[in-house]
Amino acid sequence: IMAGLVGSEMCIRDRAWGQKVSGKISDKDYENVISKSCPGPGACGGMYTANTMASAIEAMGLSLPYNSSNPAISIDKSEEKLKISSSIINLIKNDIKPLDILTKKSIENAVKLITVLGGSTNAVLHILAICKTANIDFSIDDFQRISNCTPFLADLKPSGKFLMEDLH
């Protein structure tokens, strides 16, 4: 989702709720933020679960390059349809399935990217479930091993100041 704005300030629903319950903004101001905070289709702009997992899936090789950071309403996203459709046809013709692409190395790449981006902690559960389904030996200790030697580089919301659209 592209950033929602109230004036020139980006809308943050969670922050607005805190301001409302503490009496810093009125019910009307809160409703204004809510009505503008999600102005279109796509995942929330911060590094929450959806963007974290989209990034991880891209790093695993299960989506096209730049697919995860491309805003849903961008011209580039619209143009991706052609690349995606030809890729799907190629995968079907060559009988390539996700389990043919997923490897321990691709999972490690995903965890490195999650760490670099400061991704959602929900990714641990999702990645472990993917590994179990794919019969890839991977544990929470592997997350720790990888994160110990991988820097956190992104300043993305909710803790930072940038959005997924800025990464694209």
Each model region followed by its residue ranges:
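Accessory "access/gating" subregions that flank catalytic or transport cores
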Residues: 39-48, 55-58, 62-120, 125-166
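Single conserved hydrophobic/aromatic residue that forms the stacking wall/gate
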Residues: 1-7, 11-12
